C-alpha cells in the first residue's frame, strides 16, 4: 500500500524565499570593491606621508619652529587617517563580508580578536576626535593666518564630534547593560 504524503502548500514559497535569502546573503560581497578602494586610498596616504616627510627633511633648515610643528602635525594627521582607513577596511570586512581568518598570525592587532560593530564604532569615533584634535591644534598654531569664523566653525565641529562620541558611548552602555541584565 502506497502512503500518501501531505502536500506542503508553502513548499514553492519556501523555495523562493530560500533563493531570495541566498541572494541577499551573497550581496555582502558587493562591498569587496569598496574595501579594495580603501586600500588604494591607504596607498595614496602612504605616498602623501612620504612626500610630506621628505619635504620636511629637505627644508628643515629654512623652517621656523611653528612651520616644523605644522609639518609634523600634518604627518600625524596623515597617520591617523591611515589608521582609520585600516580599521574601517579590516573591521568592516570582518563584520559585514567574511572572516579574515588571521587568528594565529603573529602580527594580528589585538583589537581584531574582539572586533564587532560596537567596538568599531567606538574606535572610529575616537579616531575622528583624534583627527579633529590635530586639525584644531594646527588651526591654533596658525591662528594668526586663520579667519576667526573658520576657527569658530572648526571648534564647533570638534565639539559636535565630542558630543556625538559621548552620546554613542552612553547609548552603547545603556544597550549593553539592558541586554546583559539577569532576570
UniProtKB/Swiss-Prot annotation:
Q: Name one GO cellular component term.
A: plasma membrane
Transmembrane domains' residue ranges: 38-58, 68-88, 124-144, 150-170
Kindly report the protein's main subcellular placement as a broad class: membrane
Record bears the keyword Cell inner membrane: no
Task: Return the InterPro entries for the record.
Answer: UPF0114, UPF0114_bac
Name the Pfam families on file. Answer: UPF0114 (PF03350)
What keywords were assigned to this record? Answer: Cell membrane, Membrane, Transmembrane, Transmembrane helix
Task: Family membership, please give it.
Answer: Belongs to the UPF0114 family.
For this protein, the record's NCBIfam families field holds: HI0507
This chain belongs to the protein called UPF0114 protein CGSHiGG_05795
Q: What's the source species for this entry?
A: Haemophilus influenzae (strain PittGG)
Amino acid at each position: 500500500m502506497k502512503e500518501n504524503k501531505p502536500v506542503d502548500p508553502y513548499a514553492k514559497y519556501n523555495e523562493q524565499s530560500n533563493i531570495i535569502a541566498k541572494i541577499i546573503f551573497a550581496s555582502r560581497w558587493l562591498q569587496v570593491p569598496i574595501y579594495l578602494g580603501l586600500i588604494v586610498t591607504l596607498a595614496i596616504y602612504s605616498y602623501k606621508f612620504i612626500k610630506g616627510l621628505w619635504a620636511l627633511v629637505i627644508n628643515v633648515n629654512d623652517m621656523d619652529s611653528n612651520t616644523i610643528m605644522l609639518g609634523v602635525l600634518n604627518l600625524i594627521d596623515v597617520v591617523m587617517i591611515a589608521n582609520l582607513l585600516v580599521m574601517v577596511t579590516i573591521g568592516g570586512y570582518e563584520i559585514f563580508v567574511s572572516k579574515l581568518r588571521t587568528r594565529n598570525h603573529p602580527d594580528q592587532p589585538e583589537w581584531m580578536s574582539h572586533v564587532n560593530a560596537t567596538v568599531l564604532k567606538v574606535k572610529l569615533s575616537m579616531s575622528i576626535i583624534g583627527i579633529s584634535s590635530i586639525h584644531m591644534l594646527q588651526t591654533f598654531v596658525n591662528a594668526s593666518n586663520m579667519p576667526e569664523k573658520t576657527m569658530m566653525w572648526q571648534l564647533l565641529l570638534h565639539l559636535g564630534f565630542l558630543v556625538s562620541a559621548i552620546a554613542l558611548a552612553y547609548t552603547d552602555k545603556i544597550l549593553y547593560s539592558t541586554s546583559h541584565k539577569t532576570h
